């Protein structure tokens, strides 16, 4: 009886692995995002020596790996490095993400992605905190298995010492996904 069950399971696994329609596919992803902020030293005066009103304020690097199901839903684990030079904050977020492709046309998709995880800070100035994010983006199909992504994201980092003990930012980014 055990041999029959094992043989049946082996046949089912073989059938599933050789079938035409696959459940999904693994992928590797990477992003670079930047955040713009208001220049706190900016003043409206005739001599404009205090710089522009809007200045870059942060840079985020992200890498991750995950699995896409039926070209509609993707689950991934990501890690990264965040640098907020205005506040001298360096952080390492690690988080899980859930991406849903809203539309798909000619290998290009529009998607929404939510993120939740932990943020680690190497400095003793700020304690570790939580990391949340939500974003919209476009993934453009490229050569073979490499796709380009463009995105806009809202990030919330739980950091004690800021207003409401959090640091919120909106970032613009581009990246890739390799299937």
Language-model region placement:
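Bacterial Sec-dependent N-terminal signal peptides
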Residues: 1-24
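Transmembrane beta-strand segments of Gram-negative outer membrane beta-barrel proteins
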Residues: 21-40
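Outer-membrane beta-barrel "beta-signal"
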Residues: 33-37, 98, 165-179
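Surface-exposed strand-loop-strand hairpins of Gram-negative outer-membrane beta-barrel proteins
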Residues: 37-60
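Gram-negative (and chloroplast) outer-membrane scaffold detector with strong preference
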Residues: 38, 59-135, 140-146
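Extracytoplasmic loops and strand-loop junctions of Gram-negative outer membrane beta-barrel proteins
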Residues: 44-49, 119, 155-158
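A cross-taxonomic marker for long C-terminal extensions/tails that follow the last structured domain
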Residues: 147-157, 163-171, 176
């Amino acid at each position: 009886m055990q041999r029959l069950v094992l043989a049946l399971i082996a046949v089912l696994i073989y059938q599933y692995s050789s079938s035409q329609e696959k459940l999904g596919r693994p992928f590797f992803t990477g992003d670079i995002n930047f955040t713009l902020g208001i220049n706190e030293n900016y003043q409206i005066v005739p001599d404009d020596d205090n710089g522009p009103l809007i200045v870059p304020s942060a840079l985020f690097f992200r890498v991750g790996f995950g699995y896409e199901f039926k070209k509609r839903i993707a689950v991934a684990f990501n890690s990264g490095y965040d640098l907020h030079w205005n506040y001298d904050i360096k952080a390492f977020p690690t988080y899980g993400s859930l991406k849903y492709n809203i539309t798909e046309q000619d290998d290009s998709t529009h998607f929404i992605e939510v993120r939740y995880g932990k943020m680690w800070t190497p400095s003793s100035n700020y304690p570790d905190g939580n990391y949340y994010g939500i974003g919209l983006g476009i993934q453009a199909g490229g050569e073979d298995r490499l796709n380009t992504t463009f995105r806009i994201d809202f990030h919330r980092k739980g950091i004690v010492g800021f207003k409401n003990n959090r640091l919120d930012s909106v970032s613009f980014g581009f990246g890739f996904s390799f299937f």
